[in-house]
Amino acid sequence: MTVLERLAATVEARKGADPDSSWTAKLLAKGPEKCAEKFGEEAVEAIIEAVRGDRARLASEAADVLYHLLVMLAARDVTLAEVMAVLEAREGTSGIAEKAGRG
């Protein structure tokens, strides 16, 4: 199991936890919209670090983005496995062709 898979499992396990006991549970309790908002905030922070060129800070912000992506997905009951299946289906397909095929 990869670090990302373990993190996804932890996020999933926190879905029913007491919001006072876990940051993840607290975010999930606020609903999908708040989870999406937080993901967007973290994505913007990663973009800023990418523009600045600070590799260490970009890596840190990218980790935050991945975590908040998993929380946002969990809030809508979308699993990491579902996302990975989509990526696997796209593997080996030109990005241009894949996008055109979406219709």
Curated annotation (Swiss-Prot):
Catalytic activity entry: 1-(5-phospho-beta-D-ribosyl)-ATP + H2O = 1-(5-phospho-beta-D-ribosyl)-5'-AMP + diphosphate + H(+)
Keywords for the protein's UniProt record, in alphabetical order = Amino-acid biosynthesis, ATP-binding, Cytoplasm, Histidine biosynthesis, Hydrolase, Nucleotide-binding
Query: Where found in the cell?
Result: Cytoplasm
Q: Which GO terms describe its molecular function?
A: ATP binding; phosphoribosyl-ATP diphosphatase activity
Instruction: Name the InterPro entries for this protein.
Output: HisE (IPR008179), PRib-ATP_PPHydrolase-like (IPR021130)
The pathway it acts in is:
Amino-acid biosynthesis; L-histidine biosynthesis; L-histidine from 5-phospho-alpha-D-ribose 1-diphosphate: step 2/9
Question: What is one Gene Ontology biological process annotated in the Swiss-Prot or TrEMBL record?
Answer: L-histidine biosynthetic process
| Class of this enzyme | hydrolase
Locate the coiled-coil region(s) and give their ranges: none
**EC number per UniProt:** 3.6.1.31
Pfam annotation, one family: PRA-PH
The record's Gene3D superfamilies line, in alphabetical order, gives:
MazG-like
| Gene Ontology CC, one term | cytoplasm
Cross-referenced CDD domains: NTP-PPase_HisIE_like (cd11534)
Report the superkingdom from the record: Bacteria
- Family named by the database record: Belongs to the PRA-PH family.
Instruction: Report the HAMAP family cross-referenced here.
Output: HisE
Q: What is this protein called?
A: Phosphoribosyl-ATP pyrophosphatase
User: From which source organism is this entry?
Assistant: Cereibacter sphaeroides (strain ATCC 17029 / ATH 2.4.9) (Rhodobacter sphaeroides)
Organismal lineage: Bacteria, Pseudomonadati, Pseudomonadota, Alphaproteobacteria, Rhodobacterales
